């Protein structure tokens, strides 16, 4: 039995996907993907599977474990891990090209991170300044 493990990162969320032969089940942290809420996060996770097609989707089972970050960061990390797993599973360069043409961050990741807050400005943000008064 063939098993492939891949990872995906987005902001502070890290996802680990395990793909194996199966019947098309997708589980996120042990829950079926069908019950993941909100809906936008669910569709984000399923994007690579929809693009790959039903034939590939129904021939594999995917288990994803995600931790860290918020719900959207986790969804996008899971999406990256699933896309990488599908490309590795099929070994199909056409699928890889399809993913890259649709959305490059599906395989490559997004390097942007939040800017650290600077000293003496408390919770206002990294670039907030006190308003200057001339009188």
Curated annotation (Swiss-Prot):
- Cellular component annotations (GO), alphabetically ordered: cytosolic small ribosomal subunit
Output one GO MF annotation: structural constituent of ribosome
Q: Which PROSITE patterns match?
A: RIBOSOMAL_S9
In the record, biological process GO terms are: maturation of SSU-rRNA from tricistronic rRNA transcript (SSU-rRNA, 5.8S rRNA, LSU-rRNA); translation
- Which Pfam families does the UniProt record give? Ribosomal_S9
Q: Where is this region: Disordered?
A: 108-135
Q: Does the keyword Ribonucleoprotein apply?
A: yes
Gene3D superfamilies tied to this protein: 3.30.230.10
Q: Which InterPro entries match?
A: Ribosomal_Su5_D2-typ_SF, Ribosomal_uS9, Ribosomal_uS9_archaeal, Ribosomal_uS9_CS, Ribsml_uS5_D2-typ_fold_subgr
Residue ranges annotated as compositionally biased, kind Basic residues, are 119-135
* UniProt keyword list: Ribonucleoprotein, Ribosomal protein
Where are stretches of biased composition, namely Basic and acidic residues? 108-118
Family stated for the protein in its record:
Belongs to the universal ribosomal protein uS9 family.
Q: What protein is this chain from?
A: Small ribosomal subunit protein uS9
Question: Which organism was this protein described from?
Answer: Pyrococcus horikoshii (strain ATCC 700860 / DSM 12428 / JCM 9974 / NBRC 100139 / OT-3)
